[in-house]
């Protein structure tokens, strides 16, 4: 039964009472939330109550659920790359569904989101739906939601990228790139390394046997053996620092600081634009395509390429193996 208030407490919001040492808010779900001391002014109590109500509402919507997921052990077990991707996907999803109660989200709502988002990017729509499903799966296993609204909602069919970077294209961009982009291009190509793994590379990864790389996405650990060309790329990276600047980053700015993805991308795009102006060719490949070129150019079987690239399955390797195969023709005279 709701406690009656005296006349002098009539100014207080519903479910706010004087406790033994503080004003308290008793929400419908039970419990008591301490607002402020008993000597607080009326406006301070009202403000504390408003903040408490908003905090509770946030906990009860999808934004609150996603926030809890991001603080969970399951999320911390994911690779740093996946964590960053999920945070990026969450911004798009929560801009639409953030204030919705998790149990009120239905498959038809997810489908509508997919259709609208897919009009711009089917790939991103798929990734964002996969993130949302992962979040709901975590919540469902803990009794926080009644269902996963993503279950049964079809993803868009994706066409695997098949862009192969020709040697002359690589050379054209390389020759117009600044030293830090040149060094990153070579390390990525020679080691089949992702951009993120190259930019986060530190000097303690440079070993006697080669370059130690733990892939940010798969956590696979490898040491890429030295070749003369790879040593030359590392020597180029050493020249990036100026004066007595010391940096732990292999690919660093003149002041020793590491490059952000966006900062590095600007140098990459400038080099590609300069090469386009000279060659009058499209050069429509991305930095990530250099990893595919590396795997495609590596001589050997699919299993050999898998060992080289660090992929967990041969199917993943096939996605990156894009070089058109030269096969015998019929010789019938």
Cite the ranges covered by each PLM segment.
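N-terminal core-binding DNA-recognition domain of tyrosine site-specific recombinases/integrases
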Residues: 73-144, 258-263, 284-286
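C-terminal catalytic core of tyrosine-transesterase DNA break-rejoin enzymes
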Residues: 123, 183-186, 190, 197, ...
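DNA/chromatin major-groove-contacting recognition/catalytic segments
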Residues: 172, 222-238, 307, 315-333
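Basic, Lys/Arg- and aromatic-enriched nucleic-acid-binding interface segment
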Residues: 126, 141, 145, 151-195, ...
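Conserved tyrosine-mediated DNA breakage-rejoining catalytic core shared by Y-recombinases
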Residues: 160, 169-172, 191, 196-242
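Active-site/catalytic core of tyrosine-dependent DNA strand-transfer enzymes
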Residues: 227-281, 294
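N-terminal DNA-binding module of tyrosine recombinases/phage integrases
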Residues: 5-6, 14-23, 27-108
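Short, polar N-cap/turn motifs at the start of nucleic acid-interacting alpha helices
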Residues: 205-208, 301-321
């Amino acid at each position: 039964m709701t406690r009656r208030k005296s006349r002098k407490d009539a100014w207080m919001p519903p479910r706010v009472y004087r406790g033994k040492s503080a004003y308290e808010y008793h929400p419908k779900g039970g419990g008591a939330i301490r607002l402020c001391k008993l000597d607080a002014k009326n406006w301070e109590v009202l403000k504390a109550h408003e903040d408490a109500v908003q905090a509770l509402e946030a906990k009860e919507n999808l934004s609150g659920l996603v926030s809890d997921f991001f603080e969970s052990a399951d999320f911390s077990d994911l690779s740093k790359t996946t964590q960053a991707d999920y945070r990026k996907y969450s911004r798009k999803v929560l801009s639409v569904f953030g204030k919705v109660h998790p149990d009120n989200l239905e498959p038809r709502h997810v489908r509508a989101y997919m259709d609208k988002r897919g009009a711009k990017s089917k790939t991103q729509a798929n990734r964002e739906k996969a993130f949302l499903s992962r979040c709901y799966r975590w919540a469902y296993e803990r009794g926080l939601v009644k269902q996963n609204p993503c279950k049964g909602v079809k993803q868009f069919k994706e066409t695997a990228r098949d862009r192969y970077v020709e040697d002359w294209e690589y050379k054209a961009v390389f020759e117009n790139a600044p030293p830090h982009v040149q060094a990153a291009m070579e390390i990525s190509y020679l080691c089949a390394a992702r951009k993120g793994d190259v930019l986060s590379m530190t000097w303690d990864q440079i070993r006697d046997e080669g370059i130690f790389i733990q892939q940010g996405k798969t956590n696979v650990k490898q040491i890429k053996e030295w070749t003369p060309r790879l040593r030359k790329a590392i020597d180029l990276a050493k020249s990036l620092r100026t004066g007595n600047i010391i940096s732990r980053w292999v690919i660093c700015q003149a002041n020793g600081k590491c490059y952000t993805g966006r900062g590095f991308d600007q140098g990459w795009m400038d080099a590609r634009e300069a090469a386009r102006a000279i060659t009058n060719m499209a050069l429509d490949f991305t930095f990530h395509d250099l990893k595919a070129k590396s795997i495609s150019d590596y001589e050997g079987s699919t299993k050999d390429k898998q060992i080289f690239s660090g992929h967990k399955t041969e199917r993943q390797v096939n996605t990156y193996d894009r070089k058109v195969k030269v096969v015998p023709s019929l010789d019938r005279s």
